[in-house]
């Protein structure tokens, strides 16, 4: 089931504001890169499509779990003669790029888990890591996503290494990700409901 939550609704433990029946919904994940959801939904008579707005949250089953949250970043403009609406969304952990600001965070001689705990202290986010090597990094005036694996130095990945998975409000950074994640997840509407299709192209490139 694919659900959508209004941007003001943060009660993700319960059902969303509406159930969606997209023509296509694709979740793609690149190792230590971009995770993105692309969705095409019909302009339906029931008006479900009207819930598809920027900042709304889509809940979909993926290789990470039955209910993974993605924040809509942008939607297509709908004209009167259009038959569908498209949306692009990113993992809800990516919200930390806007609301988790590291003014002066200095994990010193810490293992991966300890460093991430310091970086996320006092926030709604959490982390999991099996990285046992110790390292040091000073993060001053950086947002969490940039400090994790952004373009500026230093980043967590530069200092501690590891491979990243996103699980709602939790980030997992292990030496190597484990499990059968190397697949793109697709959903299409058919006569019986939502069909899941698996593609091995253009996704996580190495999984052990």
Cite the ranges covered by each PLM segment.
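Short, charged/polar, Gly/Pro-enriched secondary-structure boundary elements
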Residues: 92-100, 178-187
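Short, conserved phosphate-binding/catalytic loop or strand-edge motifs used
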Residues: 128-140, 175
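Amphipathic, non-transmembrane alpha-helical segments in extracytoplasmic/periplasmic proteins
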Residues: 30, 38-39, 89, 102-128, ...
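Acidic, small/polar-enriched beta strand-loop surface segments
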Residues: 182-208
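Surface-exposed cap/loop segments at beta↔alpha junctions
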Residues: 46, 53-131
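Glycine-centered loop/turn motifs
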Residues: 52-58, 145, 188-190
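Juxtamembrane "anchor/assembly" segments of surface/extracellular structural proteins
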Residues: 1-51, 90-94
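Hydrophobic residues embedded in beta-strands of well-ordered beta-sheets
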Residues: 85, 170-172
